[in-house]
């Protein structure tokens, strides 16, 4: 899905590195930034953020590279580096990626990946609710269970979209107050911390609204009417 005008194609890269004696958390990000800033190709395209170095190129493309230190204190542990606070933060990024891939495998046809992209696109074109991509990925993934594999609820991408948004809306409507939404592979990571009650309530209301629109578009038998109803959700260029 091409980003909206002024938007960017972006990619996230986790760079697994061994610990360097004497380095603090900020050093890993700063050294990575300095490396690219010293390169003739990248020097004018680099920006440093709290956890990553960003390279912007080709006008509408960017890549975020985050150093992740392996085994600094204990074997098989991973930590990302917060340059702003100069602290190491435990992460389970590799396990989280495996979890997402597993949920996508249950849905089949790469449909979870497609649905997640559609919902992120919906966020970007409507601009009336906010949620970080990692939190939405978790919320979507939690709606898919092992027993869903090869069921009619995930027969194709539109059906997967209807099923996932319907289940998500059902869960949201049962939780009027902001719940704790934890990383499914790192229980100490409360991902919902990025929301307050106001943002959560707005998200809850918008998903309920769009759930109704999706159900209506999905059920429409007339082709032209169906296209019009999908365009109400995803914009006039969606067909």
Predicted ranges, named:
Residues 24-31, 111, 160:
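Short amphipathic alpha-helical segments
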Residues 3, 61-117, 187-190:
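Extended, alpha-helix-rich binding/interface surfaces that flank or overlap catalytic cores
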Residues 212-239:
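Charge-biased C-terminal accessory regions appended to nucleic-acid-, cytoskeletal NTPase
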Residues 29-78:
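Conserved catalytic core of two-metal-ion nucleotidyltransferases
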Residues 1-22, 26:
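Active-site nucleotide-donor binding segment shared across nucleotidyl transfer reactions
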């Amino acid at each position: 899905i091409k980003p909206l005008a002024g938007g960017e194609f972006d990619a996230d890269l986790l760079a697994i590195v061994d610990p360097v004696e004497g380095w603090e958390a900020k050093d890993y990000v700063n050294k990575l930034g300095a490396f690219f800033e010293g390169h003739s190709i990248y020097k004018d395209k680099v920006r440093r953020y709290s956890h990553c170095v960003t390279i912007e190129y080709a006008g509408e493309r960017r890549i975020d590279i985050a150093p992740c230190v392996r085994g600094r204190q204990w074997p098989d542990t991973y930590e990302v580096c917060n340059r702003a606070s100069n602290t190491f933060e435990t992460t389970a990024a590799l396990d989280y990626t495996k979890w997402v891939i597993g949920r996508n495998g249950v849905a089949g046809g790469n449909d979870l990946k497609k649905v997640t992209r559609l919902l992120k696109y919906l966020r970007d074109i409507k601009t009336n609710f906010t949620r970080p991509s990692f939190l939405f990925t978790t919320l979507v993934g939690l709606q898919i269970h092992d027993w869903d594999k090869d069921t009619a609820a995930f027969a194709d991408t539109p059906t997967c979209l209807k099923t996932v948004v319907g289940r998500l809306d059902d869960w949201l409507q049962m939780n009027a107050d902001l719940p704790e939404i934890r990383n499914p592979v790192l229980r100490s990571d409360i991902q919902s911390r990025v929301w307050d009650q106001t943002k959560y309530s707005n998200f809850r209301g918008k998903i309920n609204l769009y759930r109704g629109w999706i159900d209506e578009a999905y059920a429409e038998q007339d082709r032209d009417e169906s296209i019009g109803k999908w365009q109400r959700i995803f914009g006039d260029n969606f067909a």
